[in-house]
Every structure is written in structure tokens, then in C-alpha cells.
Amino acid sequence: MAVKSSIHIKPCNISSSEAHNLRTPEYMRNIGEAKIYLVPQLVAYNEHWINPRFGDYDLQTHYDNIKQMVKAKTGRAMQEKERERKTKSGKIIKVAGCSPIREGVLLIKPDTTLDDVRRFGEECQQRWGITPLQIFLHKDEGHWLGGEPAPD
């Protein structure tokens, strides 16, 4: 039987996404003790997968390659910044800039495996043409209940 869940997809903040996902020492220092939302006992259970077609690139390099490809194919620079424009009625609306790399936060159960999420990624690719570049399972993120860590 299928289980209902949700995913929130938004433009990827390339400058901080990989540091957060890989739990770099600099990232861990910068989040500070007061803002800590990680359960240290569960860090060892984190898992990740990098799409072999993605190669050895980091996200910034991949983004720069996309920018070059857009310039080569269209002759124009990729429109990265949000801008405002007026409609025919004079109303001002915001037009989002290009965000070719997006990230999604998927709610999972504690027993969800990396293979389960990879199958979900394959389904997204078949249905909507979204290709997962990286998958990170953060089993160390959570909240505190009664003084004891509880994973989300």
C-alpha cells in the first residue's frame, strides 16, 4: 500500500547546500550550539548518493556549466535575478529569475532507506523529467522531546 508524504521543492542555495548536506566542519562551527538541530548520536546513520551521471562536480561547478551551456545555445546570458515588470493593466508583478538547480525536502520515516528515496527519484525522472543529482538522508536532524532527542 502506498504511503502519502510530501516534498517541498525550491531553488537551491548553492553556496550552503553542499556544506549542510556533507556536514563540513566549517558548517558545523557556523551553526553554533544555540541553533543546533542535529542529534549527535544519529550522525552515523546519515546516508548519501551522488548520481554517477553528475560526475565529480560540486554544485557550483555544475551551475557554472549550465550558465555556459545557456549562453552557447541561446547567445544570451542566463537570467538569474528576480525582476519586476508591469502588466497591461499597470499592475507590477515579480518575475522569478532562472534557477536550474533545485532542492527538495522529502518527509521520511525513520525506517526509510536510501533505495526507497532513489526509487522515488527515478519515478520523478520518469513522470516530470526531474533528474536527481544528489540524495542525502539526514537521519540526524530532529527535535527534543522531554530532554531526549527524537528524530524527525
PLM regions: where:
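N-terminal nicking endonuclease/strand-transfer module with a His-rich metal-binding environment
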Residues: 1-152
